[in-house]
Amino acid sequence: MVNTNQFIPGLEGVIASETKISFLDTVNSEIVIKGYDLLALSKTKGYLDIVHLLLEGTIPNEAEKQHLEETLKQEYDVPDEIIQVLSLLPKTAHPMDALRTGVSVLASFDTELLNREHSTNLKRAYQLLGKIPNIVANSYHILHSEEPVQPLQDLSYSANFLYMITGKKPTELEEKIFDRSLVLYSEHELPNSTFTARVIASTLSDLYGALTGAVASLKGHLHGGANEAVMEMLQDAQTVEGFKHLLHDKLSKKEKIMGFGHRVYMKKMDPRAAMMKEALKELSAVNGDDLLLQMCEAGEQIMREEKGLFPNLDYYAAPVYWKLGIPIPLYTPIFFSSRTVGLCAHVMEQHENNRIFRPRVLYTGARNLRVED
């Protein structure tokens, strides 16, 4: 029997999964992952530390971290067939569509596709973590009729990722900030894309299928696509006054403004956004160009005063990525690439303690219709 009193649109506040992976503690402004505060970790630990923590359960020592990096480097290359498939896509395709295709095609190269054992899924997770940055970067190059960029083994994981996107080796500061962004995007409890992945995994579908669904979810502007929309607004506005006018115009038309508000954080600033704001300040100080920072701060003030809304991570990640020389269409694919580790952890957990998701509906359509003789 369906209990209509339990209907909550959008499942807001509904507990849909039990997990040991992460939890958003909004009271203490902590993102708890495996018992640690992700925000605190991001100040001293890098993305590979988070990868090891989420997949192995511990923060790695130096030997473990080096072994992890070598493992991922061995997985950088993607099959030639995937490059060929990507080259067949229309040049108008969005990189998220190319990424969705690439992840899906990867499944066909897995000779143990039906195996759901933890050790096999863990191996798949490392393969995906190694290959997805390659697919992200080179799908963009291919769609723009550019030659694929080969990974460099002498660079760190994050530095190589950024290099494959921009074609130039990042500075120490650029590498640090890009790596920190990957950390902040790595895991965030049960957003739409993670829920999608767990729902798919609950059918005992494979890891690739679950992640392919997550790509589709993350593409939406109400989820991952917001960072691209933010940068496009900043580009359109060009100046501080222009951005103020743009925001006031959107507010008067009751249009949704991307980069502000969060279903969980509600009436406070996303703590990850504050860290990306500091990163934007650091990058702006390098050449003395703080226009984007001024624009963002002006927008932040307007939205706080007029709507009581605060920036989320996407709001400040967008200008940071622009400063790093990253093309706008790659902002969301990078989001997905960094979230791959969290998604893999959730799919593995779902496989190991599974109950298929099968909710009901509150039907509001017609009843008792008859076909006349």
Curated annotation (Swiss-Prot):
TM annotation in the entry: none
Keyword terms: Allosteric enzyme, Transferase, Tricarboxylic acid cycle
Catalysed reactions listed for this entry: oxaloacetate + acetyl-CoA + H2O = citrate + CoA + H(+)
Protein name, as recorded: Citrate synthase
Entries under InterPro entries matching the protein: Citrate_synth-like_lrg_a-sub, Citrate_synth-like_sm_a-sub, Citrate_synthase, Citrate_synthase_AS, Citrate_synthase_bac-typ, Citrate_synthase_sf
Family: Belongs to the citrate synthase family.
Disulfide bonds listed in the record: none
Active-site residue numbers: 262, 314
PANTHER family: CITRATE SYNTHASE (PTHR11739), CITRATE_2-METHYLCITRATE SYNTHASE (PTHR11739:SF11)
GO BP annotation list: carbohydrate metabolic process; tricarboxylic acid cycle
Record pathway: Carbohydrate metabolism; tricarboxylic acid cycle; isocitrate from oxaloacetate: step 1/2
Further details from the record: Citrate synthase is found in nearly all cells capable of oxidative metabolism.
Quaternary structure annotation from Swiss-Prot or TrEMBL: Homohexamer.
Sample GO molecular function, one term: citrate (Si)-synthase activity
Domain of life: Bacteria
Gene3D superfamilies named among the record's database cross-references: Citrate Synthase, domain 1, Cytochrome P450-Terp, domain 2
Documented EC number(s): 2.3.3.16
